[in-house]
Swiss-Prot record:
Catalytic activity reported: L-threonine + hydrogencarbonate + ATP = L-threonylcarbamoyladenylate + diphosphate + H2O
Pfam families tied to this protein: Sua5_yciO_yrdC
SUPFAM superfamilies per UniProt: YrdC/RibB (SSF55821)
Protein name as it appears in the record: Threonylcarbamoyl-AMP synthase
HAMAP family per UniProt: TsaC
Location (main, coarse): cytoplasm
Enzyme Commission numbers on file: 2.7.7.87
Family that this chain belongs to: Belongs to the SUA5 family. TsaC subfamily.
Lineage: Bacteria, Pseudomonadati, Pseudomonadota, Betaproteobacteria, Neisseriales
Organism, scientific name: Neisseria meningitidis serogroup B (strain ATCC BAA-335 / MC58)
Keywords from the UniProt entry: ATP-binding, Cytoplasm, Nucleotide-binding, Nucleotidyltransferase, Transferase, tRNA processing
Gene Ontology biological process: regulation of translational fidelity; tRNA threonylcarbamoyladenosine modification
GO cellular component, one term: cytoplasm
GO MF annotations in UniProt: ATP binding; double-stranded RNA binding; L-threonylcarbamoyladenylate synthase; nucleotidyltransferase activity; tRNA binding
Amino acid sequence: MLFPRIIAASAQRKLSVYLKKGGLVAYPTESCYGLGCLPTLAKALGKLAHLKKRPQHKGMIVIGNQFEQLQPLLQMPSENLQDMLRKEWPAPKTFLLSAKSCVLPELRGKQRSKLAVRVPAHVGARRLCQALQTPLVSTSCNRAGKRACRTEREVRRQFGRDVWIVGGRIGRQKSPSQIIDGETGKRLR
C-alpha cells in the first residue's frame, strides 16, 4: 500500500479534501514530526504560520515523493543540477532552488526568489506525498520557542484538534535537514 499503513483509503480521501480546504497535517519525518499543508494555498500557509507563531517572512520547506513532484514549483534547473539532486535524494538534505514566479511569497519567504525543497529519507513522508499526489509544506511541528514534536502524543499536546495527525515513527536523524544553496553548493544549515 502506498499510503502510510495506518490510514485507510477512505481516510486518505478525507485528508485530501481536508487539505484542499486549507487544513494542516502533522506527519513523521526524519528527525521529528513535520507540520504541513498544500503549498499552493495562501490561506493554509497563513494558518500554519499563525499556529506556529512563525514570522511570515521566513520561507518554508516543501517535500515531495520524488524530484518530478517538486518540478511544477521550480524553474527548470540545469541538467547537471537535476542529475545531482536525483543522486542526493532521498536524503535529509534540503536544496534552495529558483522558484517559479507563481510560487506564493508566503512559501518561499518575502523578497526571496528561491524555494527550499527536499525528497525526504523518511519513507512514510514520501509515501504520504505520493498517495496524496501532491508535495507538502514541511516545517518542524512545534510552536515558536518549543521543542519539535517527536511523537503523536506531543503533537496532540501542542496542537490538539487544530491539525490532522498521521501517526507513525520518526526517523533516527538527530538534527534537522541540511540546507544547501543548489546554485552555489554553499551549506546554509
